[in-house]
Curated annotation (Swiss-Prot):
The lineage of its organism: Eukaryota, Metazoa, Chordata, Craniata, Vertebrata. Induction: By triiodothyronine (T3) and L-thyroxine (T4). 3,3',5-triiodo-L-thyronine 1 binds at residue 369. The gene is thrb. Keywords: DNA-binding, Metal-binding, Nucleus, Receptor, Transcription, Transcription regulation, Zinc, Zinc-finger. It comes from Danio rerio. This is Thyroid hormone receptor beta.
């Protein structure tokens, strides 16, 4: 490199530029050493702008420099205004400031390099993700005890346990019948009533299981020390608020894709249409959709139990007096729940936030059912409503 080029190189590198984004590895306000435009990074061993980088690359790749000819004896001043007026002087300046021709790759090498960069980037992303997953905190000893208590409470109050598929019976037009292998996927459907009317026969079948289902939710709550320590008035409000949500969750996790049914209270398998016609209307769609969604989560008993505890201890139920206390209880369960999810190491992306969204879905189901309940009271004979059902869902 000539002495004059060395001086130019030093002068260009010392110049500053106002504003403009540059990579973090460059000094602030760096200029292109060729034309003085905004520099975007190190390109072919020099700090240059995108324009000069592209010009230099094209010149080398297509061997264009022999075709360049200066009209002014090779003495053109190259800046961001004049850089496109003389290709020969611009290329000479690129060489003078130190841009390396041997670093310009042909198409095949450039594609291979790009592929390698993408592969390395993806590998680092996977390693970072794996490191993040494995480094997340798992339950403490106290949290394990909390998880044990809530899991046992759920299993002790969850009808038929893990044997619900063997124990279930299908709702039919003539009542409830035993489930047989050939019944799967072909359970008879009660004829849909006209308009928005409730199918009284289906509703009467549902009322037979509603009281034990509600009782099991109450029993679940009573087995949690945090809940039992709350004032009785708050316990009642929490139970009335969460009952439909927990029953819906328990039905949703017993969704069977083969027969496209939910199993209520661990014993009655119903189709979407039967649940809708039996009084729940559009609420049935929300419960079935939740069941379909949860089937990909592969929740275990502890996760279902913790989800129920989080729903039970919702501090925003109207009329509560111990709001802060209930909020703290829910936060303890949420933290233990998150740590347990870390321990389980699910392969579903963003598993924890996606699962928390199901709480929102269940709250919506509860709100929709409250509205639907008023319609059911109009459509169905009062004597068909079990006393506990009315006690829980009437305001």
């Amino acid at each position: 490199m000539s002495e004059q080029a060395d001086k130019c190189n030093s002068r260009w590198k010392d110049e500053a530029m106002q504003n403009g984004y540059i990579p973090s590895y460059l000094d602030k306000d760096e200029l292109c050493v060729v034309c003085g435009d905004k520099a975007t990074g190190y390109h072919y061993r020099c700090i240059t702008c995108e324009g000069c980088k592209g010009f230099f690359r094209r010149t080398i790749q297509k061997n264009l420099n022999p075709t360049y000819a200066c009209k002014y004896e090779g003495k053109c001043v190259i800046d961001k205004v004049t850089r496109n007026q003389c290709q020969e002087c611009r290329f000479k300046k690129c060489i003078a400031v130190g841009m390396a021709t041997d670093l310009v790759l042909d198409d095949s090498k450039r594609l291979a390099k790009r592929k390698l960069i993408e592969e390395n980037r993806e590998r680092r992303r996977r390693e970072e993700l794996q490191k993040t997953v494995w480094d997340r905190p798992e339950p403490t000893q106290e949290e394990w005890e909390m998880i044990r208590v809530v899991t046992e409470a759920h299993m002790a109050t969850n009808a038929q346990g893990n044997h619900w598929k063997q124990k279930r019976k299908f709702l039919s037009a003539v009542g409830v019948k035993e489930a047989k292998p050939e019944d799967i996927g072909s359970a008879p459907i009660v004829n849909a009533p006209e308009g928005n009317k409730v199918d009284i026969e289906a509703f009467s079948q549902f009322t037979k299981i509603i009281t034990p289902a509600i009782t099991r939710v109450v029993d679940f709550a009573k087995k949690l020390p945090m809940f039992c320590e709350l004032p009785c008035e708050d316990q009642i409000i929490l139970l009335k608020g969460c009952c439909m949500e927990i029953m819906s969750l328990r039905a949703a996790v017993r969704y069977d894709p083969e027969s496209d049914t939910l199993t209520l209270n661990g014993e009655m398998a119903v189709t979407r249409g039967q649940l809708k016609n039996g009084g729940l209307g559009v609420v049935s769609d929300a419960i079935f959709d939740l069941g379909v969604s949860l089937s990909s989560f592969n929740l275990d008993d502890s996760e279902v139990a913790l989800l129920q505890a989080v729903i039970l201890l919702s501090s925003d139920r109207p009329g509560l007096t111990s709001v802060e206390r209930i909020e703290r209880c829910q936060e303890e369960f949420l933290l233990a729940f998150e740590h347990y999810i870390n321990y389980r190491k699910h392969k579903v992306a963003h598993f924890w936030p996606k699962l928390l969204m199901k709480v929102t879905d269940l709250r919506m189901i509860g709100a929709c059912h409250a509205s639907r309940f008023l319609h059911m009271k109009v459509e169905c004979p009062t004597e068909l409503f079990p006393p506990l059902f009315l006690e829980v869902f009437e305001d």
